[in-house]
Design a protein with these regions (language model features):
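Polyanion-binding surfaces on beta-sheet-dominated domains and ring/shell assemblies
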Residues: 1-272
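Short acidic DE-rich linear segments
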Residues: 272-279
Length: 279
C-alpha cells in the first residue's frame, strides 16, 4: 500500500503530499489481529514455504539478494551483501499475519522522507524505517546538481519507499530466517535444481553470461568488466563466488543500491545522493 501522489507533468515541479497515518481503519485492524491470533504461524512451515519458492521458481534465487563492492578508507575491498527487495516481499508473504506499507511522511527543501512500515498482526509489533530521497541529482558531465522533474522524482520516491519497506520487513523478521533464505538462494545459484531434459551449464559458462547481461543492460564495455573483476579479485574465492557476486551485482545496480559509474568507472564516478536510511 503505497499512498503517494505526484504531479504527472514531466516538466512540472515535483510535489508529493506527505501522509502520516496508516491507511487502515482501527476496526479493520482489530479484525485482522483477531484472525491472526486464531491462526498462528507455523515457523517450520514458513521456512519450508520460503525455500520451496526458491526451488520451484526459475530465476527467483538469482533475484533474491544484492552484492555490491565496498572500498574502505584504508584501501581495502570487500562485498556488501543482503536480501533484495524481492526477497523481503517473499519472506513477508510467507510469514503471514502481517502487512507492510510505505509512504511519504515529510519533506524539506532538499529531500523527501519516506517511511517503510511493517506490522506483525500476531505479535502486535510495528517496525518503521525511514529513508531520505534527494530532490536533486547530478547529470553526467555537470559540475552541480539540478532538481528532478516530476517523473524522475516519482521514480526516485518509489525506489526509496521500496527500500524503506524492505528495511522494515528485514528488521522485523527473525535473523535466522532471513539468513537461512539468503544462504539458500546463493546455494541454488551455484547448484540450481535440474530441469527435466536440460543439463545444467557449467559455472564458467554462467559467469560469462552474468558478465554479458550486466554489460548489455548497463552499457558496460568488456574491458571495463574485466578490469573490475581483476581489481576486486580478492573478493572472490573461486568461480562460484564470482558467479553469485555477478548476479547480486546486477540486482544491486537494478535496484539503485549503487550506480554503474561507481562500480566500473570509479575515477569518473558521480555520486548523486541516493535514497538511504535516515539515522
Amino acid at each position: 500500500m503505497n499512498d503517494t501522489s505526484v504531479v504527472p507533468a514531466a516538466d512540472a515541479p515535483a510535489k508529493i503530499e506527505p501522509e502520516n497515518s496508516l491507511s487502515i481503519q482501527a476496526d479493520v485492524l482489530r479484525m485482522m489481529m483477531e484472525g491472526a491470533w486464531s491462526n498462528p504461524r507455523d515457523l517450520e512451515k514458513v521456512k519450508a514455504n520460503c525455500f520451496k519458492e526458491l526451488e520451484i521458481v526459475p530465476g527467483l534465487a538469482a533475484r533474491a539478494y544484492y552484492s555490491i563492492p565496498y572500498n574502505d578508507k584504508g584501501g581495502g575491498k570487500s562485498l556488501v551483501e543482503g536480501p533484495s527487495i524481492k526477497a523481503a516481499m517473499t519472506l513477508a508473504r510467507n510469514w503471514h499475519n502481517c502487512f507492510n506499507d510505505g509512504r511519504v511522511v515529510d519533506e524539506d527543501k532538499s529531500n523527501y522522507y519516506v517511511n517503510g512500515i511493517f506490522f506483525d498482526l500476531e505479535a502486535n509489533l510495528t517496525t518503521i524505517r525511514q529513508i531520505k530521497v534527494s530532490k536533486f541529482y547530478k547529470p553526467k558531465g555537470s559540475q552541480g546538481v539540478v532538481p528532478r522533474n516530476a517523473d524522475m522524482m516519482y521514480l526516485a520516491v518509489q525506489a526509496g519507499i521500496s527500500k524503506a519497506v524492505r528495511n522494515a520487513i528485514l528488521a522485523s523478521l527473525p535473523d535466522w530466517l532471513v539468513q537461512a533464505y539468503f544462504n539458500k538462494a546463493k546455494q541454488l545459484v551455484i547448484n540450481p535444481p535440474k530441469e527435466q531434459g536440460k543439463e545444467t551449464e557449467s559455472i564458467q559458462v554462467r559467469v560469462q553470461k552474468g558478465k554479458a547481461i550486466i554489460c548489455k543492460e548497463f552499457k558496460v564495455t568488456a574491458d571495463e568488466m574485466e578490469a573490475y573483476i581483476t581489481n576486486n579479485a580478492d573478493c572472490y574465492e573461486d568461480d562460484a563466488s564470482l558467479l553469485t557476486h555477478l548476479l547480486g551485482l546486477f540486482n544491486g545496480l537494478k535496484d539503485g543500491q549503487i550506480n554503474v559509474d561507481q562500480v566500473f568507472r570509479p575515477k569518473n564516478a558521480e555520486h548523486p545522493e541516493m535514497p538511504r536510511e535516515k539515522k
